[in-house]
Each structure stands twice: as C-alpha cells, then as structure tokens.
Regions:
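Glycosyltransferase-associated regions of secretory-pathway enzymes
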Residues: 1-23, 39-186
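Small-residue hinge/turn detector
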Residues: 24-36
C-alpha cells in the first residue's frame, strides 16, 4: 500500500524503530487515504457504527484516553487530556490526520523532550518513545498544533474508563506492550 499509494512516506515507514510504530503510521496513512474507522481488535462496539457516521458531520473523531495527565510535553501547553489512538474515524484526506502524519515525519516531539518524558514516566523508555513518536502523546500534540476545528473528541469518565465515547469500550489498554519487539514490517 505505502509503496504504491503513498510512496513519499515509505522511507519514514521503514525507518521507524519498532513494529508498533510502523503499525501506528500505517493505520494513519490508510485512514488518511481512504477514510473510514480504525478500531483496535479489543474495542467492543456498543452501538452500530452508523451512529458515529451520522453524528460526526465530516469531523475526525478520536477518544479522550484520560483526563488530567501529567506528561510535561502536553501540560506545559496548558492542555491536560490524552487523546487515544486505539479508535478513530476520519473522512478521506482530512487535514487533522495529515497533521498527525506530518508530525510523525518531522518528529514533532523533539528527542530532548522525549528523553524528559522517559525520565518522568514510569513506563519503560522504549514505550515512552513510542507514545511520543506515533502514539497518544503524538496524537495529542497534533491536536494542540491543529486546534479543535473539525475534530470531535469522545470523552470517557472516571466511572467508565477506556471508552470510545458512547460508541465502544477499549478492553485491553496497552496490550501492544506485551510483545513490543524491535522487528520491522517490510
């Protein structure tokens, strides 16, 4: 797909360090190109997806993964929500998905800020690196860069965490971490 439909991103794809980064980048590229919905395999739908399509009015839709985060990369910009990437919807060629892709290509979060995040976060440095380069911290930074225009955030709450708003439940937060080996997809 990348070689034939979006060859300008192939070099970025093959140089991502971890397989999970390649998977993240691939899903953004496919959704940008075709439009549609991405759901991790552990997302249980509570309503038919038609409801999402009718409610979004050509907006991108992403979940708020958590409120009141402490990652200084984000909080220093007066923003405290973490936007998840385990489920999202976008019409084709949406500029917010393009913002995410561009931020991956140019490594929007600097290596210095990644090192600071690795020192502050309790997760292993390799996982924090993924959060900052293709995962939720990168998506959140992209949202801050882009602004709220045409992006609908579906909130969760303390009583019902890990929700894709009213659409679904994300059951296994961080399940990718179990087998996070530095293999690449070619």
């Amino acid at each position: 797909f990348i070689k034939t439909k979006m060859p300008e991103y192939y070099n970025t794809f093959v140089h991502l360090k971890y397989k999970i980064q390649q998977l993240d980048f691939f899903r953004y590229l496919v959704i940008y190109y075709y439009g549609g919905i991405y759901l991790d395999l552990d997302v249980e739908l509570l309503l038919p997806l038609d409801k999402l399509y009718y409610d979004c009015d050509n907006d991108c839709v992403f979940p708020v993964e958590s409120f009141n985060i402490t990652d200084s990369i984000i909080t220093c910009q007066d923003y405290t929500n973490l936007i998840g990437n385990y489920a999202f919807y976008s019409p084709p060629k949406h500029s917010f998905i393009r913002q995410i892709i561009d931020n991956i290509v140019c490594q929007r979060i600097s290596p210095e800020n990644i090192r600071i995040a690795q020192d502050q976060n309790g997760d292993p440095p390799s996982q924090v690196y993924v959060y900052c380069t293709t995962g939720p911290l990168l998506v959140t930074q992209s949202y801050i860069d882009y602004g709220a225009n045409s992006v609908l955030l579906l909130a969760t709450d303390d009583c019902q965490p890990n929700r894709f708003g009213y659409i679904g439940i994300h059951h296994c937060l961080g399940s990718w971490k179990v087998n996070n080996y530095p293999e690449t997809l070619v």
